[in-house]
Amino acid sequence: MPIKILSPQLANQIAAGEVVERPASVVKELVENSLDAGANKIQIDIENGGANLIRIRDNGCGIPKEELSLALARHATSKIADLDDLEAILSLGFRGEALASISSVSRLTLTSRTEEQTEAWQVYAQGRDMETTIKPASHPVGTTVEVANLFFNTPARRKFLRTDKTEFAHIDEVIRRIALTKFNTAFTLTHNGKIIRQYRPAEELNQQLKRVAAICGDDFVKNALRIDWKHDDLHLSGWVAKPNFSRTQNDLSYCYINGRMVRDKVISHAIRQAYAQYLPTDAYPAFVLFIDLNPHDVDVNVHPTKHEVRFHQQRLIHDFIYEGISYALNNQEQLNWHTDQSAVENHEENTVREPQPNYSIRPNRAAAGQNSFAPQYHEKPQQNQPHFSNTPVFPNHVSTGYRDYRSDAPSKIEQRLYAELLRTLPPTAQKDISDTAQQNISDTAKIISTEIIECSSHLRALSLIENRALLLQQNQDFFLLSLEKLQRLQWQLALKQIQIEQQPLLIPIVFRLTEAQFQAWQQYSDNFKKIGFEFIENQAQLRLTLNKVPSALRTQNLQKCVMAMLTRDENSSSFLTALCAQLECKTFNTLADALNLLSETERLLTQTNRTAFTQLLKPVNWQPLLDEI
């Protein structure tokens, strides 16, 4: 068969195979067109699951008469004009394929009127011929699109449609997803003349929360944790459910980028990683997240359905989302859920606002009425400076740099430690502790493990007790070693090294200080620098920006620690001791974890500081217990 150019009709039907998968795809494309037209009231009428009729009516800007036929042509749009527009997309649609593709597999009627016109006009097209007919009509300002007999000319496609109930369920889910990100827009969804969904404009807090509850359920709102996380051009907002509100299937996960619903592996991985320590592998988190970023940094022109995106800085986006969700889960700042309006008005800080782009948009082009997207992205005077308040903007959870995607499988060292842990003791070692004493330890101290693992030439670790202490043996003497005190000693030793390894923060922490706090900073700045902190100081604005931290403290709540150090009593303990006292000790669930800490601390010990370690050893006297036998 010779190579030849396909006819426009055949090309449109091929494109329809990508854009128009089922009736829900038609609804999505047409509702997005209505939103791009500036509509704040949209009605969706469905008959027989969308196979017989899909009608979308809006009060947007409308389409001028002279552009009606052009609207049905392929690759015709008012939303972009050049390559620069394509690389910075904020509109929901931009490809100019939807109406052409839909009209090629259905009987499509488009009726529209602009505010400047005194009468409306209607264009009709159907099937492969794509011939359009324009005639006057009666219609208010806005647009109505009717799609009748979907796939009437492609029987093979039509027979793949599911039952009316199933197809309408997909349409319902599309409307629910769109309604979650457009609080200021009213949506009405009907099926066979019956109102199924009706979302009124949600201007007030109580109305907005009711919409979220109507879509996600009251239980989700009651268990929701608010997120408002910012860094330069990045803004993460919305809600994540507490871990106890997990799902058995991934049916309550809504994510939007610049108002566009998306499915992205980078985002999914970041969310799953943030929940990893809270949820089992067969449970799914529930969330409604809005991500706003500079449109130059994300490519939405990846797939005709526009569900997939590609980030220019995937690791930055991944870690930004991970940090924001981790902070929300760690702090458990639950959303206040009120049904009484007077109570709601007293909680303005919880107001849910529709995400807005942080970029300047130049006036709209005439062809697109009030909502053509031709953005001009000027850097604002303080574009790269986070919003400041009396408390730091990025609290409590600091970045740990780029994260690798290693599996959670144990390393070879861990496997060797566990093998030794499970090894049967030699008879000579078993004689070191009497059977009676061992039984007494098990009954009174809740010993988790009684295997002996040699940690050094002097001390042997016998057991981890209540996840708080190590039972150690040296010759015939026994000692208890507090893991909390050991960890604080390890921090002090690590921060006293001549060369301290530093960890750059992916997202710097910004502090807005009072005059008293800034004076304290000037007093302690050398101390911070000595132990590996790197700040940028802005004395005129009483502001500090933390860029690097000592690697030993990279997982700590450094925002809390720094602020505590700047408000501490000057007559208290030394700076380093006071700082280590503010750090949060980890929980040791296995003997191997405790042994790693002990080994790391011993590595840092020298002849001059070994006394500090010796002072942590508390002798255990077995004689009173042996006398009772």
UniProtKB/Swiss-Prot annotation:
GO terms for molecular function: ATP binding; ATP hydrolysis activity; ATP-dependent DNA damage sensor activity; mismatched DNA binding. One of its GO terms (cellular component) is mismatch repair complex. GO terms for biological process: mismatch repair. This protein is involved in the repair of mismatches in DNA. It is required for dam-dependent methyl-directed DNA mismatch repair. May act as a 'molecular matchmaker', a protein that promotes the formation of a stable complex between two or more DNA-binding proteins in an ATP-dependent manner without itself being part of a final effector complex. PANTHER family: DNA MISMATCH REPAIR PROTEIN MLH, PMS, MUTL, DNA MISMATCH REPAIR PROTEIN MLH1. It comes from Haemophilus influenzae (strain PittGG). Gene3D superfamilies: 3.30.230.10, Histidine kinase-like ATPase, C-terminal domain, MutL, C-terminal domain, dimerisation subdomain, MutL, C-terminal domain, regulatory subdomain. Keywords: DNA damage, DNA repair. HAMAP family: DNA_mis_repair. Belongs to the DNA mismatch repair MutL/HexB family. This is DNA mismatch repair protein MutL. CDD domains: HATPase_MutL-MLH-PMS-like, MutL_Trans_MutL. The lineage of its organism: Bacteria, Pseudomonadati, Pseudomonadota, Gammaproteobacteria, Pasteurellales. InterPro entries: DNA_mismatch_repair_CS, DNA_mismatch_repair_MutL, DNA_mismatch_S5_2-like, HATPase_C_sf, MutL/Mlh/PMS, MutL/Mlh/Pms-like, MutL_C, MutL_C_dimsub. It comes from the Bacteria.
